[in-house]
Amino acid sequence: MEMERINANTIRVMLGNDDLAQRGITVLDLLGNHKQIESFFYSILDEVDKDHTFATNEAVTFQVMPSQSGLELLISKSGQKNDDSAADQTDDEGTDTQVPDYIRQQLQGLDASDQQDHQAVDEGGYIDADKAPQTELVLKLKDFEDFISLADTLRLEGGKSDLYRYKNAYYLVLTFYPNEISSDEAHDQMAVAMEFGDRSPLSSAVLSEYGKRLMETSALETARYYFK
């Protein structure tokens, strides 16, 4: 782990994959348990803030930039005391939603405007998801390692992939567009996918409503990029 003090209000921390592994954290965890993530960030702050210049009654913000080699964490004072009025803006709920949303955008290579786009992207280009008919496979995975293995094996064509977590299990939703890929080709890809998990009776609508979406649109490609 490397630390650089940018100025009196900002610290940059570089954490390699080995540093994350030693602390029991993976890049995927940054999309999961919000309380665990917040505790992790504050534990890093405790490690690097030897002079205690970040007072405990000061609001702190965290910005995360993941990379293939780990992540870069910017820790900044917000310049606001945690009095009653400030607490309304920096309570646990606010922190829980803001930090993971930012990380999710970085992992998926999206900005805020991209999230409003209704186009689906597969590894071969852009597909108009609103107009295209769809064939869907919902796959329940034994664990995250099976998802990584599947991502290494399957180069999805003519569709998109979304990863969810629901009731302590991982689910991969593969959506194919018949106007982009033949039925035989789609079934061949689904057959490969089912070597790594079990077909689930759950629908993508249920997962979207009640589950936690970890990777959107190009989950397989994202996994190959970050989990080589």
Swiss-Prot record:
| Pfam families in the cross-refs | MecA (PF05389)
User: What does the record give under GO molecular function?
Assistant: protein-macromolecule adaptor activity
What's the domain of life for this entry? Bacteria
Gene3D superfamilies found in the cross-reference section: 3.30.70.1950
Query: What InterPro entries does the database record attribute to this sequence?
Result: MecA_C_sf, Neg-reg_MecA
Q: Which PANTHER family does the UniProt entry name for this protein?
A: ADAPTER PROTEIN MECA, ADAPTER PROTEIN MECA 1
**Family assignment from sequence similarity:** Belongs to the MecA family.
Q: What is known of its domains?
A: The N-terminal domain probably binds unfolded/aggregated proteins; the C-terminal domain interacts with ClpC.
Question: What is the role of this chain?
Answer: Enables the recognition and targeting of unfolded and aggregated proteins to the ClpC protease or to other proteins involved in proteolysis.
Assembly and interaction partners: Homodimer.
Q: In its UniProt entry, what is this protein called?
A: Adapter protein MecA
